[in-house]
């Protein structure tokens, strides 16, 4: 049985600006096993976010292949890729990206509604997820009424609501203090343990870096195993 959830083969990404070509990533080979938690570190501007966008199918590589559970991204139409992202991938960002005009229950249930679940079923599943995260008393509140740590916990709940195989997180604790960083990482490890969810986390946060079991560093357009 193939234990690899996502794999990159000779991945390259560059951008053209007139006659000049900017190389962002060069000959990247990378793989993540199912159930692994991996961190991506590197200086600002090193290509971490671009790499995450490629892994999520939000951008196309200049050349090279990405396979998810053995399936080539390049074999999917844009419509199939959108459906794939909603079911198989979850996303957590530095800024929570919650919809400010919707309450917490509505925010978390949104990916389920997009998957054509009924409003009743979506809200029931979302409520149970928020209860798991000790947020059931916040379901009618709006993002502006929550603390930063609470908003990010809601963002994690939304990312996991479809029980994706892989969650991609870009600086998920960048705006949090150490206590809330620990809360978020504890949620990540709980989801990983309970559901075998894989995580790829780009971060500068030293508290988080110390906790992530496997680290990779992007430097000089390439990716390396990193020993902290």
From Swiss-Prot:
Membrane protein topology class: Peripheral membrane protein
SUPFAM superfamilies the UniProt entry points to: P-loop containing nucleoside triphosphate hydrolases
Pfam families assigned: ABC_tran
Principal location class: membrane
Enzyme Commission number(s) of this protein: 7.6.2.-
GO biological process: lipoprotein localization to membrane
Subcellular location: Cell inner membrane
Residues binding ATP: 42-49
Superkingdom per UniProt: Bacteria
Ubl conjugation in keyword set: no
Record GO terms (molecular function): ATP binding; ATP hydrolysis activity
One GO cellular component, as annotated: plasma membrane
Keyword terms: ATP-binding, Cell inner membrane, Cell membrane, Membrane, Nucleotide-binding, Translocase, Transport
Residue ranges of domain ABC transporter in the record: 6-228
Family listed: Belongs to the ABC transporter superfamily. Lipoprotein translocase (TC 3.A.1.125) family.
Purpose: Usually LolD forms an ABC transporter complex with LolC and LolE involved in the translocation of lipoprotein, in an ATP-dependent manner. However, LolE is certainly not functional as it is frameshifted.
The protein's name: Lipoprotein-releasing system ATP-binding protein LolD
Source species: Buchnera aphidicola subsp. Acyrthosiphon pisum (strain APS) (Acyrthosiphon pisum symbiotic bacterium)
